[in-house]
UniProtKB/Swiss-Prot annotation:
This protein's encoding gene: rps1
Gene Ontology CC entries for this record: cytosol; cytosolic small ribosomal subunit
Keyword Metal-binding part of the UniProt annotation: no
GO molecular function, one term: structural constituent of ribosome
Name assigned to this protein: Small ribosomal subunit protein eS1
């Protein structure tokens, strides 16, 4: 008779569960910091696997894109239909320093703008900021009734649509190409460009609901750490040295 192991005896008890490991035990929380143009700087937190061996947590975080409501960034519910994209460019301690990556409208807002008896006019243009960011801006506008108009519809003629679109692209080109990305973001928040278009096209056809509905980042320049730090108010210029005023009395020798 062959002597060997009894397979039935070596088996463990049926129904024993494997020891489950908490997946969050190997992860860390990092804070997300918004750049200067926004009022609220602490956006939220994000999870990442801890640095182990050749896998660095910082490398996993860099390049992450977060979509945040502009209402949360500005503490203003009037901006709730706009979403801002923020991109992680640098890690400092347990904080992710982000930069502006794009802007978009919520789909429900866009659908609510489209109505009967009016003309929808759209324009898009690719512009380059003074700090070499290549962006594509999409504008949207709708015709409205003139004062004391009896006619129900507000349809614009093809020649008027072309003239309005030309004016839209001119204004966007002028406003976007003459400033940095940060300055452009400051213009996009209060919708300065939309108001400029509305004012400039009054002579062609009165417009309403004029918005920059989308901003797409196509190309960015070489990463500049100093520029990013200045956006987050951590450029280190305050630590360089400050003039200290002290009470100092010049001693005068009475006798030589």
């Amino acid at each position: 008779m062959a002597v060997g192991k009894n397979k039935r005896l070596s088996k463990g008890k049926k129904g024993l569960k494997k020891k489950t490991q908490d997946p969050f035990a190997r992860k860390d929380w990092y804070g997300i910091k918004a750049p200067a143009p926004f009022n609220v700087r602490d956006v939220g937190k994000t999870l990442v696997n801890r640095t182990t061996g050749l896998k660095n947590a910082n490398d996993a975080l860099k390049g992450r894109i977060f979509e945040v409501s502009l209402a949360d960034l500005q503490k203003d519910e009037d901006h709730s239909f706009r979403k801002v994209k923020l991109r992680v460019d640098e890690i400092q301690g347990k904080n992710c320093l982000t930069n502006f990556h794009g802007l978009d409208f919520t789909s429900d807002k866009l659908r609510s703008l489209v109505r009967k008896w009016q003309t929808l006019i759209e324009a898009n243009i690719t512009v380059k900021t003074t700090d070499d960011y290549l962006l594509r801006l999409f504008a949207i506008a709708f015709t409205k009734r003139r004062p004391n108009q009896v006619k129900k519809t507000t349809y614009a003629a093809s020649s008027q649509i072309r003239a309005i679109r030309r004016k839209m692209t001119e204004i966007i080109q002028r406003e976007a190409s003459s400033c940095t990305l940060t300055q452009l973001t400051s213009k996009l928040i209060p919708e300065v460009i939309g108001r400029e278009i509305e004012k400039a096209t009054q002579g062609i056809y009165p417009l309403q609901n004029v918005h920059i509905r989308k901003v797409k980042l196509l190309k960015q320049p070489k990463f500049d750490l100093g520029a990013l730090m200045s956006l987050h108010g951590e450029s280190g210029s305050d630590e360089a040295g400050q003039k200290v005023e002290r009470e100092f009395k010049e001693t005068v020798l009475e006798s030589v």
